[in-house]
Amino acid sequence: MEFKRCSGILMPISSLPGGYGIGSLGKPARDFVDFLAGAGQTIWQILPVGPTGFADSPYQSCSAFAGNPYFIDLDLLAADGLLTQKDYANINWGSDAAKVDYSTLYEKRFAVLRKAYANFLKRRPVPGFETPYPDDWYRFQFLSSNWLPDYCLYMAIKEANGMVDWQRWPRALRIREPEALAAFRAEHAEELEFWAFVQYEFDRQWRALHAYAKQKDIAIMGDIPIYVSADSADAWAGRELFETDAEGRPRRVAGCPPDYFAEDGQLWGNPLYDWEYHSRTGYAWWISRVRHALSIYDILRIDHFRGFDTYWAIPAGETTARNGRWEQGPRMELFRALHNALGSLPIVAEDLGEMFDSVRELLAESGFPGMKVLQFAFTGEDSVDLPHNYPRNCVAYPGTHDNNTLAGWFAGELTAAQRKQATDYFALTGREGNVRGLLRGVLASAAALAIIPLADWLEEPAASRMNTPGKARDNWQWRADAKKLTPALAGEIRELSERYFRTAR
């Protein structure tokens, strides 16, 4: 796909301001949609919205299909009569409103959601009878039947076993013996329904938000990680999809070799796909996954696009990514299957990292726009990430969620020579400000789409960085201050976007 010339803002759902410990799909999200519209923006880019697990990373979700329960808006549940304000308003959701406290959320959020479920049970819909929930409860379960039952079963078994990795469950459940699963379902039927209820509420709230964004002419760019977590419903229920042994243990795991971000590479630990199996089955699982994503997003950013060409395979048990090797991916066979099943694919390819000629050829053949990141540009050479080299069919960023904030980068990561190169290149002045001058350069580029992280419009320091690759803790925590999202800021963003013909005018 090719974008008309436009711009947008990268803002994770978790980073939205508001009460109750984390951003949510209710008023905080709608207020941000209004801010985007007022700022003349076209696209709201978010991070993956799946349930977070290991290290709180949205890229290590326990499901490729489910939504994050933390994002369910409690005020909307109260408006639906499933909660009262006293059920949640006085709970301490964390000591710092500028950071997500995931431990506190884990300890307290599900108790509130269980109260909502208990109230839901009192008016549970019955087919053929008029109730406050006539059809959509059953419709949701029917439309989600390809993933929801296994996800609910996975979550219920996981909770019954102290939330340990599924590899540590009793063997009969671990290897999915039919009798053991049937007995568990019968004994824990209400628990399975609780997890279905949570996903039902997420789906209702998400689709209402998506419809609101469409009314405001804001497209949502979602993000789907290429891999799933080893401890996930997908890996447990669909082990034939992955390179695993008879017990479901990964033979090799995903990561990437040493690069700009991490000198030892990145050991992600995700199970690798059995691409031969996917090819034999016509990529049915991938078609299902992308179809679901396209039902909730307008545009998809596919993480680690280069992994569809060649991917870094690391023997299970390694402590770093250094000893991996490159293996051949599915290349265009996958994207042809997706196109044949789903039609035009509104995909943005995250094509960062070590790039082979074959990856560039795959990107060109696919027609997907790739990414350019300003923070990679100042090498002293004529880098492809310098704005004068951007092609039209790409997405320009000052930085991504894996980079420092622009202010933090300019102040603390550049050498004196690099800082001089950037200053001279953009003609930065004290009057305009370094960060504003850098953003001007991104917006002025030929790239059809420019995406600016909200943290960079706010000129947040390095402490507000979203993620540091290779760092296990203290990531994914930053939250915006609602007081900073002013009409004046929206006007400034609009003015700069209009100057470079990125608004509908």
Model-derived features: where do they sit?
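Conserved, well-ordered alpha-helix/loop/beta-strand core segments that scaffold catalytic motifs
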Residues: W195-V228
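Alpha-amylase-like alpha-glycosidases and glucanotransferases acting on alpha-linked glucans and related
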Residues: M1-R5, P12, G18, A55-Q199, ...
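Surface-exposed amphipathic alpha-helices with a cationic face
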Residues: A37, W206-K214, H339, L363-A364
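N-terminal catalytic cores of NTP/NDP-binding nucleotidyl/phosphoryl-transfer enzymes
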Residues: G8, P12-D31
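Catalytic domains of carbohydrate-active enzymes, especially glycoside hydrolases
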Residues: E2, K27-T52, S295-Y297, V442
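Structured C-terminal cap/extension of enzyme domains
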Residues: E459-R505
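Outer-envelope exported proteins of Gram-negative bacteria
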Residues: L47, A219-M221, P225, I299, ...
